[in-house]
Each structure stands twice: as structure tokens, then as C-alpha cells.
Amino acid sequence: MTRRVDLAVVGGGISGLAAAWAGMQQGADVVVLEAGDAPGGKLRTSHVAGVGLDDGADAFLARVPEAVELCEELGLGAELVSPATGTAYVWSEGALRRLPSEQLL
């Protein structure tokens, strides 16, 4: 079966999904080609004892306005959390390290 599309995005990670969203916003018929079992790329969450643990990259700098704008366009603006309003750490090089307050999770 052959399907014609305006835009084929290879990879369902955050960049691929953002590209697909941008194409759809322009009215393109879009298909996302993902080799893995789920979209998200490096963004993954595991649940241990009922607590969600982020397994991959899930933070970005709030000083990048395009990232914040994209989250708002997708209806995720209310889900953004700043480490300044809580405590957020990342495990790196064998130690817990506090995330800078200008990042959003």
C-alpha cells in the first residue's frame, strides 16, 4: 500500500515530533517514522513504587523562548516546573547535582 504525504519525519524523538508538529501547523500531511517501540527518543519515564522517574533528558533552559512557546502551543505550559520552586537533581558522574533554577522540567 502506498501513501503520499507532504512530509516524512525520520525519528520520533523530541526534535522529530517538533518538526512534525510544525509541519502539521502549516497544513502538511505528516508521517513520523520511528524505529523504537514508542515515540519520545531519549525522553522516558519509569515508575518505581508509584513514583515517576525520568530516565532521559527532560529539562531545557527557560531562556530558550522557542521551547517554552512550543510547550504552550501543545497545551503543556501548565506542566512546566522550575527547580527554583522545588528541588530537582540529576545523577551525574557518580553524584547528585542540583539543577540550575533557569531550567524548566
Name what the model sees in each region.
Residues 8-10, 24-49:
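Glycine-rich FAD pyrophosphate-binding loop
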Residues 2-7:
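Extreme N-terminal starter segment of soluble prokaryotic enzymes
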Residues 16-17:
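N-terminal Rossmann-fold NAD(P) dinucleotide-binding loop
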Residues 49-105:
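Dinucleotide-binding Rossmann-like beta1-alpha1 core, especially the glycine-rich loop
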